């Protein structure tokens, strides 16, 4: 690969531009899509909040839970870079990090998932390595043919939605019994904004509001964070015989848990 081919990946605006790019560089001269860049902040911060709240559990019981959550933070950083520059490298890293979030999430949480056949539990290490190797091969192919990444995301995301619904309903944890519906509702609205931004851009420009992709970031970030809350609760409950912690879901700022409130885990030690 010659230097011109490499430089193409890092050229400004070599990647896909969103509707907000019609106003590019108007807010800041070095940021292409200002709203799409700034709305990645929750995606960066919220996983770190969950890590902080669960730090004792992560240290004492299952430190592996930190990896998919750090990957979500990395995705927020990658998306920030992508929307600030609109270059092809940023776009691919942004999209590939989503594939790796799903992969590492599966590798970390699969021992406590009820859908995973018990007869394969003795071969868990082999299953994990197969998942990682397949994802690595797909990632390499995406650099050769970037359009493959959209296919990979579709292939990963559809069964992921099925697993989320199944695991939430089968968990037996009252605090998260409504989480599958909550997550899928957020994702549904988020993706409707994603498609509307791409397909109806001229209409939003006519209204002067080309910011639906920014709203997609906010809702998708909240949905992703809620997924980690749900599966963290499942992990804590599934391993309850091996540790001294109890956990409950709380909400901020609306304590009643409205759809746009932020769930978080209150972790306490059992009284002796």
From Swiss-Prot:
Cited InterPro entries: ACER
Location of the protein in the cell: Membrane
Major localization listed first in the record, in broad terms: membrane
Enzymatic class: hydrolase
Protein family according to the UniProt entry: Belongs to the alkaline ceramidase family.
Chain's role: Hydrolyzes the sphingolipid ceramide into sphingosine and free fatty acid.
Name this polypeptide is given: Alkaline ceramidase
Organism: Caenorhabditis briggsae
Taxonomic lineage: Eukaryota, Metazoa, Ecdysozoa, Nematoda, Chromadorea
């Amino acid at each position: 690969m010659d230097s011109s081919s490499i430089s193409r990946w890092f050229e400004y605006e070599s990647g896909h531009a969103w509707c907000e790019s019609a106003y590019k560089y108007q807010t800041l001269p070095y940021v292409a899509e200002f709203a799409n860049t700034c709305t990645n902040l929750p995606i960066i911060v919220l996983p770190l909040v969950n890590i902080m709240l669960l730090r004792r559990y992560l240290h004492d019981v299952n430190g592996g839970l930190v990896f998919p959550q750090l990957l979500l933070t990395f995705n927020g950083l990658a998306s920030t870079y992508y929307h600030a520059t609109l270059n092809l490298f940023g776009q691919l890293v942004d999209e590939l990090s989503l594939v790796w979030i799903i992969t590492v999430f599966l590798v970390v949480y699969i021992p406590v998932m009820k859908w995973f056949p018990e007869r394969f539990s003795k071969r868990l290490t082999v299953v994990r390595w197969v998942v990682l190797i397949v994802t690595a091969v797909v990632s390499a192919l995406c650099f050769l043919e970037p359009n493959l990444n959209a296919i990979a995301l579709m292939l990963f995301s559809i069964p992921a939605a099925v697993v989320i619904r199944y695991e939430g309903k089968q968990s037996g944890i009252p605090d998260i019994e409504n989480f599958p519906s909550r997550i899928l509702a957020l994702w549904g609205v988020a993706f409707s904004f994603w498609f509307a931004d791409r397909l109806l851009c001229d209409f939003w420009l006519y209204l002067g509001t080309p910011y639906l992709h920014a709203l997609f970031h906010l809702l998708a970030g909240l949905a992703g964070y809620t997924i980690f809350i749900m599966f963290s609760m499942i992990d804590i409950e599934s391993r309850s015989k091996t540790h001294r912690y109890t956990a409950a879901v709380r909400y901020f700022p609306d304590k009643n848990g409205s759809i746009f409130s932020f769930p978080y885990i209150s972790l306490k030690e059992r009284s002796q």
